[in-house]
């Protein structure tokens, strides 16, 4: 999106310089150069912030991966401790005593 903006600004500068009179040309050219410098600085700032956000995304992904690995480790320890309770077969189940008269 930012390269489009730079292209549009350059196109506007070319159109404005083509329509400018000879007397107003230097004034218009100076103002357009100032505008172009400001626009290029804005684009550079936007690109640097995008790069910083990419670094932040990579860092947060690493943090999330570590958290999920830790969670999986806790879950496996939990399931290992209680596996005996969950895997009890039908012969291990309690039977209700029957009373005979």
Curated annotation (Swiss-Prot):
Organism of this sequence: Rattus norvegicus (Rat)
Pfam families: Apo-CIII
Compartment(s): Secreted
Positions of the record's site feature: May interact with the LDL receptor: 41
Gene Ontology CC, one term: very-low-density lipoprotein particle
Post-translational modification: The most abundant glycoforms are characterized by an O-linked disaccharide galactose linked to N-acetylgalactosamine (Gal-GalNAc), further modified with up to 3 sialic acid residues. Less abundant glycoforms are characterized by more complex and fucosylated glycan moieties. O-glycosylated on Thr-96 with a core 1 or possibly core 8 glycan.
Signal peptide, first to last residue: 1-20
Region (Lipid-binding): 69-101
Reported function: Component of triglyceride-rich very low density lipoproteins (VLDL) and high density lipoproteins (HDL) in plasma. Plays a multifaceted role in triglyceride homeostasis. Intracellularly, promotes hepatic very low density lipoprotein 1 (VLDL1) assembly and secretion; extracellularly, attenuates hydrolysis and clearance of triglyceride-rich lipoproteins (TRLs). Impairs the lipolysis of TRLs by inhibiting lipoprotein lipase and the hepatic uptake of TRLs by remnant receptors.
Family the UniProt entry places it in: Belongs to the apolipoprotein C3 family.
GO MF, one annotated term: high-density lipoprotein particle receptor binding
Protein name per Swiss-Prot or TrEMBL: Apolipoprotein C-III
Keyword Phosphoprotein attached: no
Residues found modified as Methionine sulfoxide: 64
UniProt key word Oxidoreductase: no
Tissue expression pattern: Synthesized predominantly in liver and to a lesser degree in intestine.
Glycosylation site residues: 96
Entry-linked PANTHER family: APOLIPOPROTEIN C-III
Alphabetic keyword roster: Chylomicron, Glycoprotein, Lipid degradation, Lipid metabolism, Lipid transport, Oxidation, Secreted, Sialic acid, Signal, Transport, VLDL
GO BP annotation list: cellular response to glucose stimulus; cholesterol efflux; cholesterol homeostasis; cholesterol metabolic process; chylomicron remnant clearance; G protein-coupled receptor signaling pathway; high-density lipoprotein particle remodeling; lipid transport
